[in-house]
A protein has these predicted regions:
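Transmembrane alpha-helices and adjacent helix-loop boundaries
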Residues: 1-152
């Protein structure tokens, strides 16, 4: 049995396929986390904004991508969306996992932002800070601290 394993994996150099698969898996995971974080933050900002159109777009994005199984999303991305472009399979997988991760990160970040007491925003505004200054200097640092355990 051991000799069969050695003949198959070592002599046949199939271990190289396993190492290549490991490298691809790590690349997909790393890129998906980066893409998901950026998309999640952007869509979370859209969800907490006062703009109804942006809110609706973010709501549709999160509802659709969180509601469709990931394997189905991979097939839709590869065979429907990116089929005419002929993109590399690895790139399509990175994008599919990234968009899926972004939908979940959106809700994590949104809950962290909305979990900050409204008094914090009022305090920043009363100090003369603009809405964006209040958000980035007061609310966001507290929200990051609140979402880190869930995000990691």
């Amino acid at each position: 049995m051991i000799q069969s394993f050695i003949d198959t994996m070592i002599s046949g150099q199939r271990y190289l396929l396993i190492l290549q698969g490991l490298g691809n898996t790590l690349l997909i995971a790393l890129c998906a986390v980066l893409i998901g974080t950026v998309l999640g933050f952007a869509f979370a900002l859209m969800k907490v904004s006062g703009n109804k159109v942006l809110k609706a777009i973010a709501e549709i994005y999160t509802t659709v991508l969180r509601g469709i199984p990931l394997a189905t999303q991979l097939m839709i991305f590869y065979f429907v969306i990116f089929a005419p472009l002929g993109l590399n399979r690895l790139l399509v997988a990175i994008l599919a996992y990234g968009f899926n991760s972004g939908a979940y990160c959106t809700e994590i970040f949104r809950s962290g932002i909305q979990g900050i007491d409204a008094g914090q925003t009022e305090a920043g505004r009363s100090l003369g800070l603009s809405q964006w200054q209040t958000f980035f200097k007061i609310v966001l640092p507290q929200a990051v601290k609140a979402v880190l355990p869930t995000y990691t």
